[in-house]
Amino acid sequence: MIKQYLQVTKPGIIFGNLISVIGGFLLAAQGRIDYPLFLATLVGVSLVVASGCVFNNVIDRDIDKKMERTKNRVLVKGLISLKVTLVYASLLGIAGFALLYIAANPLAMWLAVMGFVVYVGVYSLYMKRHSVYGTLIGSLSGAAPPVIGYCAVSNQFDAGALILLLIFSLWQMPHSYAIAIFRFKDYQAANIPVLPVVKGISVAKNHITLYIVAFAVATLMLSLGGYAGYKYLIVAAAVSVWWLGMALSGYKNAIDDRVWARKLFVFSIVAITSLSVMMSVDSMAPAHEVLLTYLR
């Protein structure tokens, strides 16, 4: 039973989000780590993400039973009652929001609320089923965790937070479109209007390429804005160029789209993990803050 309650929270998604939270937190901390705050932020975000995933599982029950990848999920098979699941999801969310508010700051909590509402209320309940722009809207919720981590330390939504929001939102797009391509039949069977299904794989490839270019520009802004050092810059540039090269290889006539998309998806995880690690270890104070410190 415990295993089923864990599965419904989608542990893989929680873990992936924690990596980005750590990146945002340590970027803002600049080596001065408040460990109780760090732990509270990680636990708080984990609880909120878990809550969102459980609610998503409840909402997507009808869709999940039509998809090969999700047809054996806990709620599809009726292994946990709907009433208990809703209570479970609510308690997780309340605990997460409360922890962020008390142990971090109100801004971190409200950013978590924003991400939660977008994911559950806007994306899962409506956009995913009715609009090709669902992925775009959903990307905002996916970009919330690193911004929460950053703002838990800084207690302000500054240029650094905005750049993080851009980086992780833009990353979500090619990442999600790649999934939709190699899981094309699943999305088609469930009648989910993702771009590859609605507009075709060729159009999706064009969007993937453009979003990776935009992502590359956004990643460099952290260094150009003085938030991360040259080591991060080198890794960000290398990762972006490699990812773009992989995207461009998808235009070859002999390419197997499903194989190509899966490779692109796998590398997207490598890319965002690499950036999260590098912004953690190569953070620095923005130039204007260094100047103010010097003048004092």
Swiss-Prot record:
Q: How does it sit in the membrane?
A: Multi-pass membrane protein
Instruction: Give me the reactions it catalyses.
Output: heme b + (2E,6E)-farnesyl diphosphate + H2O = Fe(II)-heme o + diphosphate
Is the keyword Hydrolase assigned to this protein?
no
Location comes to: Cell inner membrane
Q: What is its main location?
A: membrane
The UniProt keyword set, sorted, is: Cell inner membrane, Cell membrane, Heme biosynthesis, Membrane, Transferase, Transmembrane, Transmembrane helix
**GO MF annotations for this entry?**
protoheme IX farnesyltransferase activity
Instruction: Note the InterPro entries from the entry.
Output: Protohaem_IX_farnesylTrfase (IPR006369), UbiA_prenyltransferase (IPR000537), UbiA_prenylTrfase_CS (IPR030470), UbiA_sf (IPR044878)
Q: Transmembrane residues, as ranges?
A: 11-31, 35-55, 84-104, 107-127, 132-152, 162-182, 208-228, 229-249, 264-284
PANTHER family per the UniProt record, alphabetical: PROTOHEME IX FARNESYLTRANSFERASE, MITOCHONDRIAL (PTHR43448:SF2)
Functionally, this protein is described as follows:
Converts heme B (protoheme IX) to heme O by substitution of the vinyl group on carbon 2 of heme B porphyrin ring with a hydroxyethyl farnesyl side group.
Q: Which HAMAP family match?
A: CyoE_CtaB
The family line of this record is: Belongs to the UbiA prenyltransferase family. Protoheme IX farnesyltransferase subfamily.
Descriptive protein name: Protoheme IX farnesyltransferase
